[in-house]
Structures are given as structure tokens and as C-alpha cells.
Amino acid sequence: MPAAAWAVAEVGAAGLGDARRAARLATLVSDLAARPDVGIPAACATPAATKAADRWLANDAVTPEAILAAHITATAERSGGEAVLLAVQGTTALDFSAQPALAGAGPLAHPAHSGLVVQSVLAVSADGVPLGLLHQHSWARDPATTGARHTRRQRPTAAKESQRWLDGQAAIADVVPAAVPVLTGADREADVCDLFAQSRPSHHELLIRAAHNRRIGEETRQPWTAARAAPGGAVVPVAVGRGGARPPREALLVLRWTAAARGRRAIAPHGPPCRPCR
């Protein structure tokens, strides 16, 4: 499909209040897709096209939410034919420290850096083909909350950034076609018990890298102990690069899995029980 036709199919129906604005969006997306390594002035064919793009961006009717909604709709349509859909959740920090005059930025992990935090859910086929975004949310941290980490156990998940994982999972259930099985993957920051306890369709599963060695249900076992005791199900060779005086080598990664019911953390014992996870 030509880039121009693809762009129209992807975002041509964006709800920007005017068909001409949607057409300009499709043109801009097509231009940027053709030259993803450059900015708008270089991607646009002429000075007039650059000026038109600038006017379009300055229009109050053009909102990130409307653009994203059109793309998410297209992603959901592409996902409908998948036997299993992978939904990859991740967090990115956009560092704008080099632009101190920029308004609206907030602190990042390093106190000297400022910018935005972006939470995305990327749909990927079982063959590893990216299908598009299912959800995205960006925000600037409030400087007044910097250094409040010591109070995290006294605050509910909804009052912490950890809520982003639950919101992403809820968005997946909202937009993915109902019959499509989904496996959501995320890194250690997503090891939040409320995420496992949150209601989700029975054919939506979670694959989360463990960060906390919590006790399993009413048992005395802990998940890392249980995993080590499970039989090896697969062996994958992994190339390990050189480190210091250590030469490069090939390691063998042994994959083990087991089913277990996770208990809730002690500070929230009365919430819904966690579903079994594997």
C-alpha cells in the first residue's frame, strides 16, 4: 500500500472537527513516515507545506487524544485476526533538560533532569510484528511529590504511578476485539499485586518480570523458590558480551514455569484475591 493511502487508512478518520484537518494529519503522517529520521521542516516537501503543518499543529482543535484514538482504532482492527496478541507495556522518560524554557515539564529520575513520562502499550503479533499502540498516556511529575517514596506503603495504588500498569491493562480489555487472547508483558516495575488482582477477561493473561519474592497464597513457599524447583521446560542459548577481564561467552538460559496463587500484600489484606498466575 502506498504511504499516502496507508496514512489515510490509519488516521484519516481522526475526530478533529473538520475533514481538512484530518486530511492534513494524513499528509503529515505520510511525509514523516517517508523520512522518520528528520523533523517536520525537512520531511515536508516545500516551505508552504511546512507552514501549513505549523498552522495545523497550532490549531486548538488538533489534540493528541484525537490523533491517538484514530491510530488505536486501526491497531484494534489489525489485532482482530491474531490467534494470540502480545501487549507490551513499558514506560519511557522524555528528557527535555536541554530546553529549560519549555513549560509543562516535570522532574525525572535524576533531580537535574526534567521532561515527561510516557506509558505505552504496544500490540505485537506472535511472530513479532508490531501492530501499533493500544494505549498511551503521558504526564509531567509534580515537583512537590519528589522525595515521597518513603510514603509509598501508606498510599493506595491509585495515588501512585503504579496505577499506570492497571490503566494500561484496562485499556487493553476495552479496545482489543473480545475473542482475541491477549498476553500482556511488562518489566519489574509492573510487579504490583493490584495488577494481578484487577478484573480482566479470562483469556487475558499477564507475564510480569518478578521484583518481589512474595509468599505464595497460604503456603510457605516463595515464587523464586518454587520456580527453581520446577523442571526445566526449555533451554535457550544466550550470547553474553565481554565484561572487564571476562571474555565473551555463550550461556544457557533454562526456562522453568509453574502455576501458583499469589497472596495480597499485608497492607491491603481485604481486597480481591489474586488470580492464579503462571
Task: Show which residues each predicted segment covers.
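Single, function-defining residue in the core of a domain
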Residues: 1-102, 110-117, 122-278
